[in-house]
Amino acid sequence: MKMIFKMAWRNIWRSKRRSIITISSIFFAVFFAVFARSFQIGVYNKMIANMVGMYTGYLQIHQNGFWEEQSIDNSFIPDQSVLDLLHDNKDITDFNERLESFALTASDNLTKGAIIMGVNLEKEDGLMDLSPKLISGEFPAHTSSSLLISEGLASYYNMSVGDSLILLGQGYHGASANGIFPVSGILKFPMPNLNDRLVLMPILAAQELYAAPERLTSLVLQIDKPEKLNKLKKYISKKLDLEKYELLDWKSLLPELVQTIQADSAGGVIIIGVLYMIISFGILGTLLMMTAERMREFGILISIGMRKSKLILTLIMESLFMGILASIIGISVVSPVRYYFNRNPIRLEDQAAESIEAFGFEPVIPASLDMDIAMNHAGIVLLIVLICTIYPIVTILRLKPVKAMRT
């Protein structure tokens, strides 16, 4: 076997022109496959970060059954062990306590349903980026009973800072949840479903309104390394009492986004598939050329006693060596390109940019730095190389030494 390795390696460099052509074709295959997929995954990651940062976070903890029946009666008082678990984990940068419910808002002769969200506004600003969305007024103090209302709600009631809004709802276990609250600020959200009906208030005031002291409907976990999400979820699941609590990631919280990505990814897979077809024909073409050039060589080797099985194994080793070498070069060359476009993403312009900016998102297309993309596509290209090697293998099996030496 050692001799076959040596022969395969020396054969590669015996005909440098031929080897360089083969390695170049595989190199470009790896480069373009990784380059194209990196942008596609980069767009998905940016979309996820935008949507998750808009409202849900990457992970949420609720009382078991809350997500199926989102009622304030399914709120909970978090155990100290849960809070300690979240505080002690270095992958969790922070967590937001929320008390969410529904209420009827009213002013003068108008009424409208709204989402009432009691939060720690300082923490929520870190997740939802509230400061740039504040178009009028100021954030209420943590102990205040003032409200932040969305622009759509303010327009509906023709309200401004300093006016009062009536809230009518049902509190914990049927308690009355009514009150008149001053408006301290107005927020403009890019998402219509939030901009038309969201009311934020300090969590202490919300707990008092709904007669739910110390109770929460969700703990929203903030993480700065989304690639560690699955590992973090598994770790917390092992430590959490899953009979009492439920732990949901963004995929469970935003199933529509998952479906959108899956539908778009299917189109991307088709494009990558077409690219692989082109790649396959390119690699096959170089192997056809290599086989035709070496017919006499193969005939001589078989004539002097080399078994066809060893010759085939040598040829497979040659293809693997060239494939691995080309993949390493391809990954090495594409990595700084991916890094550049990750730090300096392609900026969209004109109408495309305006349509994205309308939702409050940055109109950019970044490249993903996920090494799994490079390794997976390098592996696929190597598999294509091995499949294309079937032709020279069949040629050797059918080879007649005398005829081949006359070629």
Q: What is each PLM-predicted segment?
A:
Residues 1-34, 44, 49, 53, ...:
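N-terminal Sec/SRP start-transfer signal
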Residues 171-268, 275:
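Mechanotransmission and gating elements of multispan inner-membrane complexes involved in transport
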Residues 37-115, 138-143:
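Hydrophobic, regular-secondary-structure patches
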Residues 329-376:
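Short helix-loop junctions at transmembrane helix boundaries
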Residues 16-43, 262-297, 320-332, 379-387:
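Hydrophobic alpha-helical transmembrane segments of multi-pass inner-membrane transport and secretion
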Residues 364-407:
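C-terminal membrane-exit region of the final transmembrane helix in multipass inner-membrane proteins
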Residues 288, 297-342:
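Transmembrane alpha-helical interface segments in multi-pass membrane proteins
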Residues 99, 112-119, 134-204:
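Hydrophobic secondary-structure segments that place a key small or acidic residue at a functional site
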